[in-house]
C-alpha cells in the first residue's frame, strides 16, 4: 500500500493484490479531482482501464419523523464506459440494469450496519461507471469506492469497508479474477468486511460482514475433471483467503482518508436520535416482561402476533399519561424488549419462539403438477412459508437479451421472484419488482444454474417464476426448493436436485463460573422474527454433494471460524433432510407437458442459411405458416424447430432439409405444385421449398394458343406438372400433366406387370 499527493489537493492511495502465478491487480483510489462539491468523492481504478466515480452526499437537516435510516445507494451504468451507444429508442440510459441493481445491494448490505444507530440524515451514495474493460467486473471496485467516499464525507461511519471477489481456480483462491479466468473457476464469491483489531501475530483482524457466493455453471464438469468440489469446508477456506485482501483494501482507504485530512464531523452536524430513552425502556420492561415472555411461547405466527399486539396496546394505554407525546418511544422500547427476550431464551435455554430446538426444521411439504396448463409446477411449504414454482419452456430465441455493461448478453434461464403483500397478511403496492424481489430472484437463479442442462442437452429457454404465497422466514430458499420440483415436473433433466435453507445466529455474553464468555447459538430454518432479532442471516443452497449458492449478512464484528464452519455443517444436515422430502414428491424428470413445445435441433451448412431464410424472410415465413412450427436459426447453422406436436415439427424439418440438404429433382418427376408467380412468358410453380420451375405460356393452353397467362392460371392455383428439362444452370422447365394421365401412371405403378404373351398362351 502507498499514498501520495499527485498534485496539489489530489491524493491517491494504492493497494496491490498479489495472486502469485495469476499475476497482480492494482486498485487505486483518488480524491480531490472529480465531484468536489460532494461531501466525499473517490475515483476507483482497477488496473488501467477500469474507472468509476463514487460520490457520497448527506442532507443538512435530519428527518426526525423517520423511524429508519434513510440510506440510498444508486449505481449508474454509462454505456460510453464500454464504447457503446445505448440500444433504447431514445439512445440514452434508462432504468437500471439487473447488474446495477444487484451491485446496489452489494454496496448497501455492508455499508448500512456501519453507520451509527439513530442517524436520520438522508445519505446518498451514487456510483457512476466511467470506463470498463469487457473482461472485468466492476461490482467489487464499486464496494470499495463507495466505502472510501463515505469515509471521506466525515459521516459517523465505522468504516472503511473492503470488498473483494475471490474465485477458486485450479485449486487457488484468486482475487479480482477477470471474466476469462472465471470460465475456469469452480466457485466464485464476493466478500466484504472491515478491520476490527489486530491478531496476536500483528496481522489485521478482519470481520466478515457480507458474502455473496455461487458455484459456476461449469462446476460439475470441472469437478469430474479433478477440481475440488465446493464443499462446506472449501467455502470456509475461501472466506479466510479473502481476509488479507480485504485488509489491504481497507488500509489503502484509511491511508487516503488520513492523507486528505478527512475527519468525522461533530454530533451537532449529524445528530443521533435514539429510538427511546432509558426511562421509557425501564417502564415498558416493568409492565410488559412477564406477559410478553408468555406470549412469545405461542407457536403459531398469527396467534403470537395477535397476543403481542394486545400486550403492546395495554402497555401504551398504561404508560400514555406518564409519557405523553413519547408514544413512538414506547413502541420502540417494546420492540427492543421483545428482541431481548427472544435472544435470551435462545442463548440460555436453546428454546425458540415456536417451541423448536435450535436444529429443528418446520413441517415440510412438497407436491408437483398443481397448475393444469403450466409446463411444470410445484408447491413447496416449510411451516408458514409457502412457495408456488411455475416453469415455462420455449424456443431458445426467447432467451432474455441483455443490454448492460456486464459480460452476459443473453440469459437462457430466467428466474423471477414475486412477493405480494398478501403473503404476510398485509396490504401494499403490487406491480413492477422492487430491489428485494430482484435480489431474491437472482439468488435462487444462481443456486440452480450449476445443475441446469446445457443448450445442446436441452435446447430450450427456461423461465422460472417463484410466487411467495406465504412468508415466515426465507422465501428465497423456499423458491430454490419449489423451482427444483417445478423444473423436474416440466421434464428438465437437472444434473442434481438443489435445496436451500436459511440459518441464523444469536450471540450473547453469559456468566459461567463467575466468568463472562461469548456464547453463539446457530439456528436452523429461521423464522421472520428470528431473522429480524438475530445477528446473522445465512442462506445456503446446494446439492447433496456441494454448495451451489450462499448469502451471508451479519451485524457482528466478526464470527469465529469454528462457529461459521459449524453453521455450514448444520446447514448441510438440514439440506439433506429437505432433499429427502423433495425426492418423495419427484426424483426424476417427468414427461414433458403436452402444452410444452417440442424443440428439435438440426444443422444446416452455413452457406445455406440465406436460402433457408429467403429474401426478406420469405422462405422461413412460408415454412412457419404452412407447418405452424417455430424456427430459429443461429449463425453457426444450428436450427431450432419447435412445435407442440410431432408432425408439425417433422414437416418443418423436412422442408428445411429439402433446401439445405436438397435431393435434386430429376427429369420425369411429377409434382402437385403451387403457382407462385405469373409473367408474360409463363407461370412459376413451387415444387419444393426454394425450388421453382417454369411452365412456358406455350405449354399452358393444352395445344391451344393463349394470349395471357392469367386467362388460364393465377397465383395460388394448384397444378399437376412434370419436369420436362433441367438445363446446365439448374433451371427447371415444366409441362402440365392431365389428371387422367397422372391417375393412369399411378395405377400402372401400383399394378403388377402383365405376363409375357407366350407364357400366357402356354
Curated annotation (Swiss-Prot):
| Gene3D superfamilies cross-referenced by the UniProt entry | GHMP Kinase, N-terminal domain, K Homology domain, type 1, Nucleic acid-binding proteins
Q: Which UniProt keywords apply?
A: Cytoplasm, Magnesium, Metal-binding, Nucleotidyltransferase, RNA-binding, Transferase
Any one annotated GO CC term: cytosol
Its Gene Ontology molecular function terms?
3'-5'-RNA exonuclease activity; magnesium ion binding; polyribonucleotide nucleotidyltransferase activity; RNA binding
Top EC class per UniProt? transferase
| Residue ranges annotated for the S1 motif domain, each copy included | 668-737
Alphabetical GO biological process terms? mRNA catabolic process; RNA processing
Where primarily located?
cytoplasm
Q: Which HAMAP family has this protein been placed in?
A: PNPase (MF_01595)
Per the record, the similarity remark reads:
Belongs to the polyribonucleotide nucleotidyltransferase family.
The protein's name in its UniProt record:
Polyribonucleotide nucleotidyltransferase
Instruction: Give the species this sequence originates from.
Output: Mycobacterium ulcerans (strain Agy99)
Amino acid at each position: 500500500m502507498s499514498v501520495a499527493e499527485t498534485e496539489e489537493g489530489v491524493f491517491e492511495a494504492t493497494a496491490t493484490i498479489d495472486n502469485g502465478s495469476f499475476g497482480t491487480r492494482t486498485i487505486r483510489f483518488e480524491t480531490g479531482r472529480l465531484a468536489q462539491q460532494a461531501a466525499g468523492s473517490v475515483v476507483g481504478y482497477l488496473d488501467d482501464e477500469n474507472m468509476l466515480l463514487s460520490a457520497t452526499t448527506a442532507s443538512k437537516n435530519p428527518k426526525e419523523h423517520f423511524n429508519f435510516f434513510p440510506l440510498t445507494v444508486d449505481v449508474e451504468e454509462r454505456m460510453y464506459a464500454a464504447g457503446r451507444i445505448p440500444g433504447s429508442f431514445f439512445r440514452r440510459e434508462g432504468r437500471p440494469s439487473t447488474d446495477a441493481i444487484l451491485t446496489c445491494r452489494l454496496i448497501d448490505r455492508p455499508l448500512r450496519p456501519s453507520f451509527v444507530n439513530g442517524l436520520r440524515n438522508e445519505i446518498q451514495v451514487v456510483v457512476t461507471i466511467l470506463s470498463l474493460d469487457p473482461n472485468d467486473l466492476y461490482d467489487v471496485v464499486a464496494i470499495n469506492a463507495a466505502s472510501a467516499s463515505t469515509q471521506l464525507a466525515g459521516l459517523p461511519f465505522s468504516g472503511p469497508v473492503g470488498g473483494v471477489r475471490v474465485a477458486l481456480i485450479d485449486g487457488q483462491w484468486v482475487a479480482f479474477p477477470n471474466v476469462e479466468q472465471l470460465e475456469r473457476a469452480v466457485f466464485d464469491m464476493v466478500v466484504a468486511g472491515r478491520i476490527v483489531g489486530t491478531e496476536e501475530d500483528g496481522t489485521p483482524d478482519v470481520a466478515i460482514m457480507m458474502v455473496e457466493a455461487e458455484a459456476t455453471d461449469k462446476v460439475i464438469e470441472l469437478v469430474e475433471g479433478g477440481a475440488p468440489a465446493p464443499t462446506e469446508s472449501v467455502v470456509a477456506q475461501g472466506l479466510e483467503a479473502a481476509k488479507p485482501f480485504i485488509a489491504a483494501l481497507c488500509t489503502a482507504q484509511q491511508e487516503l482518508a488520513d492523507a486528505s485530512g478527512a475527519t468525522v464531523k461533530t454530533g451537532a452536524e449529524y445528530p443521533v436520535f435514539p429510538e427511546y430513552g432509558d426511562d421509557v425502556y425501564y417502564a415498558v420492561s416493568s409492565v410488559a416482561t412477564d406477559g410478553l415472555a408468555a406470549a412469545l411461547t405461542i407457536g403459531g405466527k398469527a396467534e403470537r402476533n395477535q397476543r403481542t399486539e394486545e400486550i403492546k396496546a395495554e402497555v401504551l394505554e398504561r404508560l400514555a399519561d406518564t409519557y405523553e407525546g413519547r408514544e413512538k418511544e414506547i413502541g420502540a422500547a417494546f420492540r427492543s424488549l421483545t428482541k431481548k427476550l427472544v435472544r435470551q431464551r435462545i442463548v440460555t435455554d436453546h428454546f425458540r419462539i415456536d417451541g423448536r430446538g435450535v436444529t429443528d426444521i418446520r413441517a415440510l411439504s412438497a407436491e408437483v403438477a398443481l397448475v393444469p396448463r403450466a409446463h411444470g409446477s410445484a408447491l413447496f411449504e416449510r411451516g408458514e412459508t409457502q412457495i408456488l414454482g411455475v416453469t415455462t419452456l420455449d424456443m431458445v430465441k426467447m432467451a432474455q437479451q441483455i443490454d448492460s455493461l456486464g459480460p452476459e448478453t443473453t440469459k437462457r434461464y430466467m428466474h423471477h421472484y414475486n412477493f405480494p403483500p398478501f403473503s404476510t397478511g398485509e396490504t401494499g403496492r403490487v406491480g413492477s419488482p422492487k430491489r428485494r424481489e430482484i435480489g431474491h430472484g437472482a439468488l435462487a437463479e444462481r443456486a440452480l444454474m450449476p445443475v441446469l442442462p446445457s443448450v445442446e442437452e436441452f435446447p430450450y429457454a427456461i423461465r422460472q417464476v417463484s410466487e411467495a404465497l406465504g412468508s415466515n422466514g426465507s422465501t428465497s430458499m423456499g423458491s430454490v426448493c419449489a423451482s427444483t420440483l417445478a423444473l423436474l415436473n416440466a421434464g428438465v433433466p437437472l444434473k442434481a436436485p438443489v435445496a436451500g435453507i436459511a440459518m441464523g445466529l444469536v450471540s450473547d455474553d453469559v456468566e459461567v463460573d463467575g466468568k463472562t464468555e461469548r456464547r453463539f447459538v446457530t439456528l436452523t430454518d429461521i423464522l421472520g422474527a428470528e431473522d429480524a432479532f438475530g445477528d446473522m442471516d445465512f442462506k445456503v443452497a446446494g446439492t447433496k454433494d456441494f454448495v451451489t449458492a450462499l448469502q451471508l449478512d451479519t451485524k457482528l464484528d466478526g464470527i469465529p471460524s469454528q462457529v461459521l464452519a459449524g453453521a455450514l455443517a448444520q446447514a448441510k444436515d438440514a439440506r439433506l433432510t429437505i432433499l429427502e422430502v423433495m425426492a418423495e414428491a419427484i426424483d426424476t424428470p417427468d414427461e414433458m407437458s403436452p402444452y410444452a413445445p417440442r424443440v428439435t435441433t438440426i444443422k444446416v451448412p452455413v452457406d445455406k442459411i440465406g436460402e433457408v431464410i429467403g429474401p426478406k424472410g420469405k422462405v422461413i415465413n412460408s415454412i412457419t405458416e404452412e407447418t405452424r412450427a417455430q424456427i430459429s436459426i443461429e449463425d453457426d447453422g444450428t436450427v431450432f424447430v419447435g412445435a407442440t406436436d410431432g408432425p408439425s415439427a417433422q414437416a418443418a424439418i423436412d422442408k428445411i432439409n429439402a433446401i439445405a440438404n436438397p435431393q435434386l429433382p430429376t427429369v420425369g418427376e411429377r409434382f402437385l405444385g403451387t403457382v407462385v408467380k405469373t409473367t408474360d412468358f409463363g407461370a412459376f410453380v413451387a415444387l419444393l421449398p426454394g425450388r421453382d420451375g417454369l411452365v412456358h405460356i406455350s405449354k399452358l393452353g393444352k395445344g391451344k394458343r393463349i394470349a395471357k397467362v392469367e386467362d388460364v392460371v393465377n397465383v395460388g392455383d394448384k397444378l399437376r406438372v412434370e419436369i420436362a428439362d433441367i438445363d446446365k444452370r439448374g433451371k427447371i422447365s415444366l409441362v402440365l400433366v392431365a389428371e387422367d394421365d397422372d391417375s393412369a401412371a399411378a395405377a400402372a405403378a401400383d399394378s403388377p406387370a402383365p405376363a409375357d404373351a407366350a407364357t400366357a398362351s402356354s
